[in-house]
Amino acid sequence: MRWSESVYSLRSTLKPLFQPDSPLTLRKRNKSLCEYNIRRSRRRPEEESIQSLSKHVSTTTQPCPTDGRMMFDLSNPYHSSETVVGRDAEGPANPLDTPFSEFCFSQLVSNSAHSYLDFDLFDEPTPGTNQAQTIEPGQQTSGFENPIPYHTHRNDTPILDWSKLDRYQSLHQHSAAQFYDSLGTEQDDSAARCTLALFSGRIVADKAETNPFLIHKTHRTTVLLQNAHVGGRRQQAVLDKCYTGLGYTSLGSVRTKAR
């Protein structure tokens, strides 16, 4: 049996809410075991900046252009892709910064679904109370496919913008609408379909690990995902968010194993 491993790094804003009550089950094939290292920054929010956040990552690339593409560092022997979500001083925010991406990432690190109204988003209006819908596992939503790379609703369905590597190692952006427990997407450039299922109820959060040589605490969180698409590649969608107003950052990696 041969295993292929792809490593992605992500950065996202989230609230460090961890509930270790839910068991992690590995019963089906074609699932990915992902680990996130969640860190809380001790700097004051007003002192934080996008540039200072990149200093927390040891091996980084240049910030991604404003058209939504990102650059990767392939020097790692494990083909690690260190992603830096950047923002030019005069350019717009990364189009992957959406309320729904915040919501999905909060499901990855917490058992309960949270509202995303308390997150300020670059160049985006804060959704009203009639738009902020807490999507519980198993809840049905309608609507599908939205190639516009920013927050939108279709039939009261939040749309997630995400990215995927092609065979030329170029990152392309795609969109998805949530159906039940999964995210269904259809690629813009081909007829291939991709399904990414978020098992928000199957999350294990370990206790906080304190390193006396570090200035922050690290929370290790394990989450079960399902990721399958044509071409034999199992790539985890990158949910990127880079905002320092709350003083929280997430610096970690997603390790995807496929058989």
Curated annotation (Swiss-Prot):
<keyword id="KW-0479">Metal-binding</keyword>
<keyword id="KW-0223">Dioxygenase</keyword>
<protein>
    <recommendedName>
        <fullName>AM-toxin biosynthesis protein 11</fullName>
    </recommendedName>
</protein>
<comment type="pathway">
    <text>Mycotoxin biosynthesis.</text>
</comment>
<dbReference type="GO" id="GO:0051213">
    <property type="term" value="F:dioxygenase activity"/>
</dbReference>
<comment type="function">
    <text>Part of the gene clusters that mediate the biosynthesis of AM-toxins, host-selective toxins (HSTs) causing Alternaria blotch on apple, a worldwide distributed disease. AM-toxins are cyclic depsipeptides containing the 3 residues 2-hydroxy-isovaleric acid (2-HIV), dehydroalanine, L-alanine which are common for all 3 AM-toxins I to III. The fourth precursor is L-alpha-amino-methoxyphenyl-valeric acid (L-Amv) for AM-toxin I, L-alpha-amino-phenyl-valeric acid (L-Apv) for AM-toxin II, and L-alpha-amino-hydroxyphenyl-valeric acid (L-Ahv) for AM-toxin III.</text>
</comment>
<keyword id="KW-0843">Virulence</keyword>
<feature type="compositionally biased region" description="Polar residues">
    <location>
        <begin position="50"/>
        <end position="64"/>
    </location>
</feature>
<dbReference type="GO" id="GO:0046872">
    <property type="term" value="F:metal ion binding"/>
</dbReference>
<feature type="region of interest" description="Disordered">
    <location>
        <begin position="39"/>
        <end position="66"/>
    </location>
</feature>
<keyword id="KW-0560">Oxidoreductase</keyword>
<keyword id="KW-0408">Iron</keyword>
